[in-house]
Every structure is written in C-alpha cells, then in structure tokens.
Curated annotation (Swiss-Prot):
It comes from Oryza sativa subsp. japonica. Transmembrane segments: none annotated. A motif (DEAD box) lies at residues 371-374. It is an enzyme of class 3 (hydrolase). This is DEAD-box ATP-dependent RNA helicase 13. Residues 128-137 have a biased composition (Acidic residues).
C-alpha cells in the first residue's frame, strides 16, 4: 500500500530571486546527470526537513520516510533468501546468518563513508542540501513515475521468484530423479540400455521403476515376478506365490507395492495442483501403507535393503524394525512416518502393544505381506503374528465401507483408501483343491476363526482375510530345488565328520561356503576346531547379539572365499552373491529346512554344490529326505582317502588343543563368577586347599601350559607343510610317475623352504596346500568324478530282496549239486 504523495515544496524554499546566477542551474544539471534519481529524493527530503523545522503540522505520519531508502511509500519488503540463510526451503545455521548480516552492515557503512553523509541524511539533521529548486512540479511527477516503476519491478520480481520456488517444489521428483541422479548413474555406467529392458516395459512397469531396474542390472523379470506383477499391480488381486529359492520373490511383491504407491502419489500431485488446500493436508501426514513380515532379522534387513535400492530415487521411505536393536532408535525412525515397514513379528508387536501411533493406525494400510510363510506357521513360533493379524482392519472389499469405518479418515485422502491386498510368499506350497471355497467361507467367518491356530498356509491365508479371487502362483511343481544345484553326500561316522569337513575346506576350499548345523553347541565346537586348524570362519546363531550377527553377514559378503558356520535360522531367504558350496554338517529335521539351506547356493541361474555329511544315525532321516524330494539316485562326493591320514594327524592335535583351552577358559570363568558374586555380596572367599594342594595345582597348570605350547608348535609345523598323500615319498620319485603338476608343486615347495616363508592361510584362494592335486571347487570335483548311488529305500529293498533270492537260489543249487554227487558216490559204491 502506498501513502499519499508528498506535498510540493513550501514557497519559502523555492527560489524567488530572479537574479539567481545561471551557474547554479548548470551545477544542478550536472549533479542530475551524475547522481541520477537521487536528486528528487534530496529535494523531497529537504522539503520535509524545512516543513518540520518550520513547525507545520504534517497530516501523513509516514511522510518522514519520504527521503529515506524506502522511496516515500510503504510496501511489502522483498526478502533476499541469501540474507536470511534460506536455500531451497532449508534454513542455514543462525550463527552463520548473524555473521553474514554483520558483514553486510560493515559494507554499507563503508559505502556511506565513501559517498558522504549528505547522501543518506535523514530529515531533521539540519544540514540538508537543496539541489533542484528549479525543477518544481515536473520534478515531483518524475519522482512519482520512477517510484511506481520501481514498485512494479519489485512486485514482478517477487512473483517470478515465488513461481520458480513453486515449480521446484512441485517438480522435485521429476527434476531429481530424471536429472541429476540419472545423469550421475549414466556417468557411473550402472544403467542398462533402454532396449535391454523391453520385457519390463511389457509389464507396464512405472518409468521410475524401470530406471531402478536398469540401474540394478535386471534385464528381464524372473518367472515369479512375471506371473505376480500384472495381478498384483494392475488387477489389485491378492497373491499366494511359491517358487524356488533365489527366484526373486522379494521384488515379486516389492515392485507392485512401489508401483501402486507411485501411481497414488502422481494422482495426489495432480489433485493438489488444482486444490492447494488438499496439497497442504496431504503433506502433513504419511500413513503406513505397507507392512511386510519376515521370520528372521537378517531377512527383514535384506528385504528392506532390496526395496530401498528399488525406491532409491522415489519419495517412499522403507524402514526395518527388528529385535536386538535399540527401540528408541526405531521409534525415531517411525516418527518419520515411513510408507513401508519391514520387520519381524516380535519387535513389531512389542511396539504396537506400547501404542506406537504409526503402527497402530492401520486404517490406510494397503498392503500386508508375509514372506517365508512356511516358517511363520511352525508350531510354537511367532505367537505375535496372530495378534498382528487380528489388529488389521476388517474390509469386505468396498471402498465405501472402508471410508465409513475408518475413525480418522479425515487425514487420509480418498485416493489412498484402497482395498487391502495380502501377499503370501514361500518356497514351498501345499494347498487343497477346495482352497478358494475355504477362502470364501473365511471372509464371512473371519472373526469366528480368529482364535484358531495358524497351522498351515491355508489357515494363515484364511485368517489374513484373503479374497476368494486371489492369484495362486505355484512354480514349485516341477522342481523345488534350484535347477543348477548339484547335490551330493559323504558317508562317515560322527567322529569323522570334522575330518571330512576339513578335507573339503582345505583341498576344495574355493568360493564362499556356508556350513549349517542344527544346534548351537555343534556350531561352537566346529568353529573352535576350524579356528585352531588355521581356518578363519564366521559364525551366526540366535544367541549372538544383533550387531555381531549383522557384522558377520557384512564380512561374509566382502570376501570371495569366506566361510560361515550358521544354524537353521540363517537358511531363510538370505541372498548372497555367488555362494559356491553349502555343507550340511548335521542333517535338518525337515525337508523344508533342507530346501532353504540348499537354496543359499545356485541362485540367480548360477551353479552351486550341496554336500551332506551322513553318519549311520542319519541314514534313516537321509533316505526319508530323499524320498520326499523324489530322488532315487544321488551323487557321492569324491574323496581321495590317501590324504585322510595327514588330515587325521592335524585334527587330533587340534582336538587336544581345543580340549585344553576349553577347560582353562571354563575354570577361569567359574573363578571370575565366584569372585564377582562374592564382591557384590560383600563376602570374602576362603580357600580350603592346603599348601601341598596349591603347589600340586601350580605344577599341574604349568605342565598343562607346557603341553599346550608343544601341541600348538607341532600343529603349526604340520600346517606349514602342504597335505601329502600316504603313498607319497620324497626319497623315491619315479621319473615316469611325476606329473607336470607335481613337478611344479615340488619346485614351489623347495622355493618356500629356501626362503623360510611357508605359511598357511585357509581363506586365500591362491594358497598351495595339497601335493599331487590341483585345488578346484567342490562343484568341479563333483562334476569330474562324482558317482551316482541309489538312495531310494524302495529300490534298495528291491535290490536286497533280489540279492537274497539270488543267494538262496545259489544255495539251493549248491545243495542240489552236493546231493547229486552223494547219490552218484553211493551208487558207485554199491556197484563196487
């Protein structure tokens, strides 16, 4: 708003002397040319000053500003973003703003000193200079015109800046995703060509998701992804999917979720451009849209990482919620209102029961996912899953009822309120013929069956209120295990399992290897023995802290020849690049666990090897396992028994060392426990041992320590030498029997002995540990010399029956021949 224009100068200030010399006028004109528009300001300022000094009453209270920098009128001040530290909506640090403001003030003061005090003098200073007395009314009109044009320019500049800011905020996704990030990825060489992802375009995948797929390097969808995506993303159906491990089930449900959320965001953006109030309301709240449950913490983090990679350039947040980590930190993550939450049932229910607002407000939940559902339904596990399912809002498939039954639907846009989709994925699937009829009945009696136990995938799907038209995708009928998986076994005793395992790791230890145990005690024993033998192994089991488990997983991913010893909890869904070998140190208790164990290798159409160590006590379980997998023949892993004596020598020393160290550590732990508890209770420990017993104990400990050092030294000497077969002799080397490989190995061994630098590191692929044999992967050894053995119980029984019949037949023939000979002898005697 502008104030009234300043009045003309009073008559006493106008020059009334006609004898004014013309030199003054010329000086004024020169000043006008040099100082531009500042002359009218000084004239108005002089007029205001003279008026105030004359004591006249000024009606306009803002007239005193006529000579200031404001230009004689009031207007909205134009804010410079740089002056207030605002860049793209973000405010700089206040201290930095103050420092910048101080620098600007100093610069202005320096300018004042250079120009002189008369340029910035305020009315009432008493020493104003009048320079344009002869201009009169023409000068005032010129000043007003310049002020109007200046005001229009400022308003226009402000409008342009505001429009540019709105454009940046509205097109933030397109500019960021299609601009800088894409350009950076292209420069890095991580994106495939557009013609290489034609199969994804046929599925009508969102362009931003196609960009993510190109960046991840997925040229075409896997069969499970191709089958599930149209039904889930475009038809809005529930999906029950089953496929072999490593087939891409995570993106099979992850991409439809991201597709739907992106489409809803685009609709919301279009509506917000038409109605600004809707945009303000939508920007305030981001409700929970997708809840994904997994049985293990590692799998939850892996699923979260995969979804984050797919949604890297999207305005969609994905947060993992698992046990073993700080609840306070996870609550802070949930305060950000992420659209997708991936977690385990235990920690999710713990946060729900404490009243976390983001998790209990499920009115806008559009996706509910159960990954590895066959593990979820095991009896005695995941009681929290049933409680979480009971908290889900009841919807019968109509949008109107969903809106009516939502208590706080005012904060959720209508386009976000969708029929909830339920996804159930597993590596195994067993559904009855009338499963769809059960689902139809389950929708009516969902509340009545809420108290039933989740004993099967059918019961789980029924309680999760899946719709009768759910899409069932079962790709496990032909082959449950990966196609390129080579299965094998080794028959040995329980005591020899360690020896054969060490043989595999030392002779064929190439590539990443996972060793599975059924018990934590066996895992600890095995990892301790392998570490004594110089093999650096990683461990992962349920009694470890979550940070240690995550660290072990990261270290396993980093090294190409790493070895991990884990329990069955690690067998579910974990995806590692290029795991070459899986070893079953102990057979699992069920076929499903065996499938998940073996599925850690041969993923993404790559080859892999599985080796099972079978003891006499495991034979019945092993044959039952083969029968359930419809396997009649299985390859027996080739073992060169000439190396086993050298392996047993090392293993014997390692077991003795491990036994002594375990005993010492147990004694130290007991002593520290007694001392710690005695100190906490304020008691003094008294030893009842006599002096002789103490001396005897000291001597025994000293002898044990000396024995331990000797054993360690002997083992170190053995480990410094390569494994030698029993028939190998260094004294008598037949020239004809020395192969080029053996000759090369002997030359290398002699060089090492001369240099004195022989060392063994079990995790280096270039190490030399075996004489007479080149180090190859177990898969290659199995393909080269593996022999198929019948593992079918029925066939073995048939073979035994045939062998028994043949034996009886032979016995009868022998008996008949003997009787025939006796008769002939008797007849011959009678004749004589």
């Amino acid at each position: 708003m502008a104030a009234a224009p300043p009045p003309p100068p009073p008559p006493q200030l106008q020059s009334s002397d006609p004898s004014t010399p013309p030199q003054e006028t010329s000086q004024v004109r020169k000043g006008k040319k040099s100082r531009g528009a500042k002359k009218p300001r000084r004239a108005a300022a002089a007029a205001a000053a003279s008026t105030s000094s004359a004591g006249t009453m000024v009606e306009d209270p803002f007239l005193v500003l006529a000579g200031g920098k404001e230009g004689g009128f009031l207007e909205l001040e134009e804010i410079d973003e740089a002056d207030f530290g605002i860049f793209g909506g973000a405010v700089e640090d206040l201290g930095e703003i103050d420092r910048k403001a101080g620098k600007d003030q100093k610069k202005k003061k320096r300018k004042k000193r250079k120009r002189g005090d008369d340029d910035y003098a305020l009315p009432g200073d008493g020493d104003l200079v009048v320079e344009c007395e002869e201009e009169g009314e023409k000068g005032e009109k010129r000043v007003k015109k310049k002020r109007r044009s200046r005001k229009k320019r400022k308003v226009k500049e402000m409008e342009e800046k505001m429009e540019s800011k709105e454009d940046v905020s509205d097109d933030n996704v397109e500019d960021m995703q299609d601009g800088n990030d894409m350009e950076q990825d292209n420069n890095d060489g991580l994106i495939l060509g557009e013609d290489e992802v034609y199969a994804w375009r046929e599925l009508r995948l969102h362009p931003l998701l196609i960009t993510a797929v190109r960046r991840l390097g997925f040229k075409e969808p896997t069969p499970i992804q191709k089958a599930c995506f149209p039904a889930a993303a475009h038809q809005g159906k529930d999906v029950i999917g089953a496929a072999e491990t490593g087939s891409g089930k995570t993106l099979a449900f992850g991409l439809p979720i991201l597709q739907r959320l992106l489409e809803e965001q685009e609709k919301a953006m279009r509506l917000s451009r038409e109605d600004e109030s809707t945009q303000d309301e939508n920007s305030r709240e981001s409700p929970l849209r997708a809840l994904i449950l997994t049985p293990t913490r590692e799998l939850a983090k892996q699923v979260c990482d995969h979804l984050k990679e797919a949604a890297k350039f999207l305005r969609i947040q994905v947060v993992p919620i698992v046990g073993g980590l700080s609840m306070e930190k996870q609550e802070r993550l949930l305060k950000r209102k992420p659209e997708i939450v991936v977690g385990t049932p235990g920690r999710l229910w713990e946060l729900m029961s404490t009243g976390n607002q983001h998790l209990i407000k499920l009115h806008s939940l559009s996706f509910f996912v159960l990954d590895e559902a066959d593990r979820m339904i095991e009896r005695g596990h995941f009681h929290e899953l049933q409680s979480i399912i009971e908290m889900l809002p009841v919807t019968n498939g109509s949008d109107e009822q969903t809106v009516g039954t939502t208590p706080s639907c005012e904060t959720v846009p209508i386009l976000q309120i969708k029929k909830r989709q339920t996804f159930v994925f597993s590596a195994t699937l067993a559904l009855s013929a009338n499963f769809r009829k059960k689902l139809k009945r389950g929708l009516v009696t969902a509340k009545a069956s809420a108290s039933t136990d989740l004993s099967s995938i059918e019961a789980l799907s029924k309680q999760a209120r899946m719709k009768p038209n759910a899409e069932i995708v079962d790709l496990t009928k032909a082959s449950i295990l990966p196609e390129k998986l080579e299965e094998s076994f080794i028959e040995c005793s329980d005591d020899d399992k360690d020896a054969y395992l060490y043989y595999i790791l030392s002779v064929h230890g190439q590539g990443r290897t996972i060793i599975f145990c059924t018990s934590i005690a066996a895992l600890r024993h095995l990892s301790s023995i392998l570490r004594v033998l110089g093999i650096n192994v990683l461990t992962n089991h349920a009694q470890m802290q979550q940070r240690a488990r995550m660290k072990a997983v990261d270290r396993f991913r980093e090294s190409e020849n790493s070895i991990l010893v884990a329990t069955d909890g690690f067998a579910r869904g974990m995806d590692f690049d290029d795991v070459r070998t899986v070893i079953h140190y102990q057979l699992p208790h069920s076929t499903d666990v065996y499938i998940h164990r073996s599925g850690r290798t041969a993923r993404k159409s790559m080859a892999g090897c599985s080796i099972a160590l079978i003891s006499p006590a495991d034979k019945a379980k092993f044959y039952s396992l083969c029968k359930s997998l419809s396997k009649e023949n299985l390859q027996q892993f080739p073992v060169d028994h000439a190396y086993m004596p050298a392996v047993m020598n090392r293993l014997t020393l390692a077991r003795q060392i491990d036994k002594i160290t375990r005993k010492n550590s147990q004694e130290n732990a007991n002593k520290s426990w007694l001392q710690r508890n005695a100190e906490s209770m304020g008691l003094l420990l008294e030893t009842s041992d006599s002096e002789e017993e103490r001396v005897q104990g000291h001597k025994q400990r000293k002898a044990t320590s000396a024995n331990l050092q000797k054993l360690q030294q002997d083992l170190s000497e053995l480990l410094q030498r390569p494994l030698q077969p029993k028939t190998f002799s260094r004294r008598y080397l037949a020239g004809a029997g020395v192969s080029p490989l053996l000759q090369k190995q002997l030359e290398e061994l002699s060089k090492r002995n001369v240099k004195g630098s022989a060392s063994v590191n079990a995790n280096k692929g270039s190490r030399f540990v075996v004489i007479g044999q080149d180090q190859i992967e177990p898969l290659q050894a199995l393909q080269n010399s593996g022999q198929e053995v019948c593992v079918s119980i029925d066939k073995q029984r048939e073979k035994r029956r045939l062998a028994e019949n043949w034996r009886r037949k032979k016995q009868k023939e022998k008996k008949s021949t003997r009787e025939q000979k006796r008769k002939e002898k008797r007849i011959a005697k009678e004749r004589d």
